[in-house]
C-alpha cells in the first residue's frame, strides 16, 4: 500500500486493510474503533508532514537547505528508491559511470550526449520500523507509537542526508610536497629516513574529475587515488618535521600519518593534532572537538612520532563507494559537470597554506580578495558564507580586533532602569559587507552561517542567486536547487500478526547550475 501524498499516511486505506484482516485473536471491534479514531481524526501522524517536524531538530540542515529553491520529485511508484531522472549535461568527455558511482551511469552515446538516464538507487537511505497494533491506544492519551516510530526513523534518515550534503568521506590524496625538517637542539627524531602520508577528508564524490592523478583507477570507486608518500631524510638531533602539501581541491581537512621509527617506510600511523602536530610556526593546534584527528591546514610540523596504531585507509573502495557531491565540492571544483575549473581565471579559490586571516581597514584581506574576483570575473556576489564554528570565531576575532564592528549601547528599554546604559558582552558577526556589491541587484550583505559538519579551516562563499547583471535583460536566477523526494512510507500489513512492519526512505539531491559563482578559502589557521 502506498500513500497518496509523500510523507503522509493513507489512513483510509490502512483502516480498510485492517478491517479486512482476519485471525488476529482478541483484537475486537472496540479496539479497532479506537484505532480508527486515532488514525483518522486526532492523531498527530495523520495528515501531518513529518519532514517539517524532523527538520526542527536538525538546525544546520534546515538553515542551508531551506535557503535554496526546491524541485519536488514525482509522486507515486516512480518516487521510490528505483526512481529515475533525466539529467541534462552539456559538457563532453563526462565519465558518467565514475561520477554516478555505478556502471549503469554510462548510458548514452560518447562525446556530448544530450541526456543520460540515472537510476540513483544507491543514493536512497531507508530505515525499517515496526509497531504493535495493541500499543496504539488513543483513549488513554498516549502518543501514537506509529507516529513516534516513524519520526524516529525519519530523524535517522535526515541525519544521514545532512552528512551527505555537508560532508563525511575520506579519500587518499597524491604525494605531499614536504620541505624537510626544521633544525633543533633536541633529539625527538633520530637521524634517518622518515615516511609521511596524508589523506584528505572530502565531500561525497571524486576529488576532481579530470585527467592526471585524480582520475579514478579502473575497477575502483570514484574518487580514489594512490596514497601519497613523502620520504624525509634527517640529520641528527632534529626537533620536528616540517611538512606541507598543496591544497587538494574538494578537501575539507587532512589527516597526517608518520612512521613510528626511522627507516621504516612501510608502517605509518595516524598523528594526534593535540600532542603530535603543531602549526607551521610551532603554535599549538586547537581542534573543535576532543579527539578530532584531522586538521584544516596544509602546512604543519610533526613534533613527535605517532603513539597510536591507526593505519592509512585501505584502497579497496569498500568505505567510499557510490557517494556523491556536497556543498564544499561545488565551491572548490566541479565533478558532476565534468570540467576542471581550478585554473587561473576560472575558479575563485584561495590556498592559505596554514596562515591565519589577514586584517585590513576594510575587513579581511582574503575574503575581500575573493569578493572582488567574483564581482570582476562573474558579475555576482555571494549571499552566504559557511564555515565551522571555530572558523567563524576566527573571523569574528579578527574583525573585532581590527575595530571593523560597531558596539551597541543598550538604552532605557520600557522604563527599566536595570537595563539602562549597559553594554552587551560578546560579539556575533552574523554578516559581512560586500564592498563590491553596490549595484546590479547584488546583495551588499552576506549572511554568515556556522555549520557544525564542516571541519575547521575552510570557508565557503556561496552565491545562491544570480543578479540581473550576470545575464543582462534577465530576472534574478538561481544557482542552487534541491531535487526533493520527501519521506515515503510503505506498509506491508500483516494478515495474522499484530506487528505492523513498514519502511521509510528519503532523498534530496543538491544541484548547482552556476559553479563558477562559488568561491572557497581553504587551509586557514583558526584558533
Question: What are the functions of these language-model segments?
Answer:
Residues 151, 155, 369-372:
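Solvent-exposed, polar/charged alpha-helical surfaces in well-ordered, non-transmembrane soluble domains
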Residues 37-128:
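Assembly/oligomerization interface modules of large self-assembling protein complexes
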Residues 154-162, 166:
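Sec-exported extracytoplasmic/periplasmic mature domains
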Residues 167-336:
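Disordered, low-complexity "stalk" and linker segments at domain junctions of extracellular
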Residues 168, 379, 383-384:
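Extended amphipathic alpha-helical segments with heptad-repeat/coiled-coil character used for oligomerization
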Residues 2-42, 47-51, 55, 136-137, ...:
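Sequence/fold signature of self-assembling virion shell proteins
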Residues 146-149, 157:
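Stable alpha-helical elements in mature extracytoplasmic
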Amino acid at each position: 500500500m502506498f500513500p497518496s501524498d509523500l510523507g503522509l499516511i493513507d489512513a483510509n486505506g490502512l483502516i480498510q486493510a485492517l478491517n479486512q484482516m482476519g485471525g488476529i485473536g482478541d483484537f475486537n471491534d472496540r479496539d479497532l474503533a479506537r484505532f480508527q479514531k486515532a488514525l483518522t481524526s486526532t492523531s498527530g501522524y495523520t495528515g501531518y508532514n513529518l519532514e517539517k517536524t524532523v527538520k526542527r531538530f536538525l538546525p544546520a540542515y534546515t538553515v542551508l537547505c531551506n535557503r535554496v529553491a526546491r524541485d519536488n520529485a514525482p509522486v507515486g511508484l516512480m518516487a521510490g528508491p528505483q526512481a529515475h531522472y533525466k539529467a541534462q549535461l552539456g559538457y563532453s568527455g563526462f565519465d558518467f559511470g565514475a561520477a554516478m558511482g555505478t556502471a549503469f551511469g554510462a548510458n548514452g552515446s560518447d562525446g556530448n550526449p544530450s541526456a543520460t538516464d540515472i537510476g540513483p538507487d544507491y543514493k536512497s537511505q531507508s530505515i525499517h520500523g515496526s509497531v504493535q497494533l495493541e500499543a496504539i491506544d488513543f483513549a488513554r492519551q498516549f502518543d501514537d507509537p506509529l507516529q513516534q516510530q516513524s519520526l524516529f526513523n525519519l530523524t535517522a534518515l535526515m541525519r544521514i542526508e545532512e552528512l551527505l550534503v555537508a560532508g563525511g568521506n575520506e579519500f587518499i590524496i597524491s604525494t605531499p610536497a614536504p620541505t624537510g625538517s626544521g633544525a633543533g637542539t633536541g633529539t625527538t627524531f633520530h637521524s634517518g629516513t622518515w615516511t609521511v602520508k596524508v589523506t584528505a577528508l572530502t565531500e561525497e564524490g571524486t576529488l576532481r574529475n579530470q585527467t592526471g592523478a585524480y582520475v579514478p583507477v579502473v575497477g575502483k570507486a570514484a574518487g580514489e587515488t594512490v596514497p601519497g608518500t613523502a620520504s624525509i631524510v634527517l640529520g641528527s638531533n632534529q626537533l620536528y618535521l616540517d611538512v606541507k602539501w598543496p591544497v587538494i581541491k574538494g578537501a575539507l581537512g587532512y589527516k597526517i600519518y608518520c612512521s613510528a621509527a626511522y627507516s621504516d617506510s612501510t608502517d605509518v600511523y595516524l598523528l594526534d593534532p593535540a600532542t603530535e602536530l603543531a602549526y607551521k610556526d610551532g603554535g599549538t593546534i586547537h581542534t573543535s572537538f576532543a579527539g578530532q584527528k584531522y586538521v584544516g591546514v596544509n602546512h604543519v610540523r610533526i613534533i613527535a612520532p605517532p603513539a597510536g596504531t591507526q593505519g592509512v585507509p585501505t584502497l579497496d573502495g569498500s568505505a567510499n563507494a557510490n557517494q556523491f557531491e556536497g556543498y564544499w565540492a561545488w565551491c572548490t571544483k566541479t565533478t558532476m559537470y565534468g570540467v576542471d575549473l581550478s585554473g587561473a581565471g576560472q575558479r575563485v579559490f584561495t590556498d592559505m597554506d596554514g596562515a591565519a586571516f589577514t586584517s585590513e581597514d576594510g575587513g579581511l584581506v582574503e575574503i575581500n580578495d575573493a569578493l572582488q574576483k567574483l564581482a570582476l570575473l562573474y558579475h555576482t556576489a555571494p549571499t552566504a558564507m559557511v564555515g565551522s564554528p571555530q572558523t567563524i570565531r576566527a573571523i569574528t576575532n579578527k574583525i573585532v580586533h581590527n575595530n571593523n564592528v560597531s558596539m551597541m549601547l543598550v538604552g532605557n528599554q520600557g522604563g527599566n532602569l536595570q537595563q539602562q546604559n549597559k553594554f552587551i558582552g560578546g560579539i556575533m558577526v552574523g554578516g559581512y559587507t560586500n564592498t563590491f556589491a553596490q549595484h546590479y541587484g547584488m546583495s551588499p550583505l552576506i549572511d554568515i552561517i556556522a555549520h557544525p559538519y564542516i571541519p575547521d579551516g575552510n570557508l565557503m562563499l556561496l552565491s545562491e542567486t544570480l543578479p540581473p547583471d550576470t545575464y543582462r535583460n534577465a530576472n534574478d536566477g538561481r544557482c542552487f536547487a534541491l531535487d526533493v523526494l520527501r519521506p515515503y512510507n510503505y506498509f506491508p500489513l500483516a494478515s495474522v500478526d499484530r506487528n505492523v512492519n513498514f519502511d521509510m526512505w528519503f532523498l534530496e539531491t543538491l544541484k548547482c547550475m552556476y559553479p563558477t559563482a562559488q568561491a572557497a578559502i581553504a587551509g586557514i589557521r583558526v584558533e
